[in-house]
Amino acid sequence: MKLKILVSAIVSIIIWPASITAQSELIPMIEIPAGNFYMGTLGEDENYDEAPMHKVYISKPFKMGLTEVTNAQYELFCPKHKLLRGKNGFSSEDDEAVVFVTYQDAVAFCDWLTQKEGKTYRLPTEAEWEYACKAG
């Protein structure tokens, strides 16, 4: 019998626009410059759903969290999340990436942080995330 475990994390958040100079009070940010990169793969083997490879332009710089959102950061928004720490052996420490959150939870966290700091926070698009990881 195979055991499937769904683990999702808030991989990062971004602040828009990048022209905002003040740092987040809660999330250390890094600026990602505008640029272009090849997104996806050639679609060979297990990566068939990421084909075709194509050029993507990121037209404006943006700021992204330096690390994934941590348990400690997320639990300022949702203290009950502490009950999930260490579940199935995942992410038990303050500085580890928060897991067991849904897309809706992640959006709600961004909305909460927007209200708290008065700056616009949102999740990165797939293209922004891949660019920051590969080329940015």
Where are these regions (language model features)?
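Bacterial N-terminal signal peptides
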Residues: 8-17
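C-terminal, low-complexity/hydrophilic appendages and adjacent surface loops
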Residues: 46-51
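Positively charged n-region of N-terminal signal peptides that target proteins for export
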Residues: 1-5
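Basic phosphate/pyrophosphate-binding loop/patch that engages nucleotide-derived ligands
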Residues: 27-29
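Boundary at the C-terminal end of the N-terminal hydrophobic targeting segment
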Residues: 20-24
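Active-site microenvironments of metalloenzymes and redox enzymes
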Residues: 36-45, 56-136
